[in-house]
């Protein structure tokens, strides 16, 4: 993927499009999804239109669509770009967690 395609706003738009697609595949109206996951229908509508939503509301929608494990896996493994970055990560692992 091109570096210019890795912008947060594009990710937000893609996530919103994917959520809308899952909702429509399941034949759910926004109101029905809202009742199931506890996120107000106007919030779902705004998310689908703009990509903007709170993390809590996004998680509620994703869990309703059974994506708990996939969301839990985000940021769960180490990623690095250079050998220097990997060395730094390994050094930091020896530090006390949370400090």
Task: Describe these PLM feature segments.
Residues 1-25:
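A short, Lys/Arg-rich alpha-helix, primarily the initiator
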Residues 19, 30, 41, 55-58:
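Helix-turn-helix DNA-binding elements, focusing on the entry/boundary residues of the two helices
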Residues 27-45:
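Short alpha-helical DNA-recognition segment
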């Amino acid at each position: 993927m091109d570096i210019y395609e890795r912008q947060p706003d594009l990710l937000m738009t893609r996530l919103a499009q994917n959520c809308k697609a899952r909702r429509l595949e399941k034949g759910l109206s926004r109101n029905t999804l809202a009742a199931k996951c506890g996120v107000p229908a106007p919030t779902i509508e705004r998310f689908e239109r703009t990509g903007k939503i709170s993390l809590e509301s996004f998680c509620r929608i994703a869990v309703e669509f059974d994506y708990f494990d996939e969301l839990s896996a985000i940021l769960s493994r180490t990623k690095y770009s250079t050998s220097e970055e990997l060395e730094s990560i390994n050094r930091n692992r020896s530090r006390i967690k949370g400090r």
